[in-house]
Amino acid sequence: MPEAPTATVADEQELRERLRGCSTTRWLADGRVARIEGGLSNRAWRLDANGERWFVRLGHPQAARLGVDRESECAVLRAAAAAGLAPAVHACEPACGLLVTRFIDGRTWTATDAQRPGNLRRAAERLRRLHELPVPAGIHAVDYEHQARRLAATLPEGDATATLLAGQAAVAFARIGDGGRATVLCHNDLHHLNLLDDGDRLWLVDWEYGGRGNPLFDVASFLALHDLGPAATAVFLDAYGRLPAADRSRLEDACWLFDYVQWLWYRSRFPEPVGDEAWFAQRLAQRLLRCNN
């Protein structure tokens, strides 16, 4: 995890106040901190205290509006950590806006890393392990169709692109259906920036969109986020080994729908996007419109 330039004094002061205000994190408040770059919605730090190193996140104050259930995230993260898929959790305190986990001294994957056959197999095996875990009580359901409707409702009326894509999405969701699939623990944001490699183990981080859901969309998230071609997709699916033939035939729909929900998220999160956000939202829209659903 690379460190960003010096964080603002106000940010660091807020972090320390939050840490002092929560009984499980009070002892960390005087630790040495370094801001970690990245993240569209949250702020994060590396924190050294009492000879130990931690990752600390201050969550976005309007997480619920973004479709994030912090209580459920805590349960998902603890289950994943117990299985060795995610860093061990020291404190998950939604009321304080804090998440504290062990700091993983590893390298964040690049887009190129996510295309290499050996790494595709490693990522697929991690995802398979996640989908094999029992689903703990209290995990919220991640329903992509519901999320799409909720996000679409936040867009301005009269948006021709949004109207066209909503019609295509309805057809794609109907084709996928539920297929009698059992719901499993899902990450739902398998971007290479959420994969940390310590040289031995591949760790999945950033679980705020995790939940109980359709495994097809979790597979689609990795394929869509990395724009995998047929050969790379075959490597990933063979290593994953849990996707029935009927679901393989629906992967194109699932990838399109994942991109659609991403586009809606960006449009609702950044009503007037600029810079990287504007470029990415436009790129997603162009990709969605090129596909005939």
Question: Model segments located where?
Answer:
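ATP-binding pocket architecture of kinase catalytic cores
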Residues: 36-141
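Start-of-helix signal in alpha-solenoid helical-repeat scaffolds, especially tetratricopeptide repeats
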Residues: 70, 249, 253-257
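An alpha-helical support segment within catalytic cores of ATP-dependent transferases
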Residues: 8-27, 31, 132-188, 198, ...
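ATP/Mg2+ or Mg2+-diphosphate-binding catalytic cores
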Residues: 3, 7, 154, 160-163, ...
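Short amphipathic alpha-helical segments and their helix-coil junctions
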Residues: 171, 201, 233-249, 284, ...
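Active-site activation/catalytic loop segments of kinase-like enzymes and analogous catalytic loops
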Residues: 216-245, 257-272, 286
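A general structural signal marking secondary-structure boundaries and capping sites
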Residues: 23, 84, 127, 131-135, ...
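Active-site acidic catalytic loop and adjacent metal/ATP-binding pocket
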Residues: 34-56, 89, 171-217
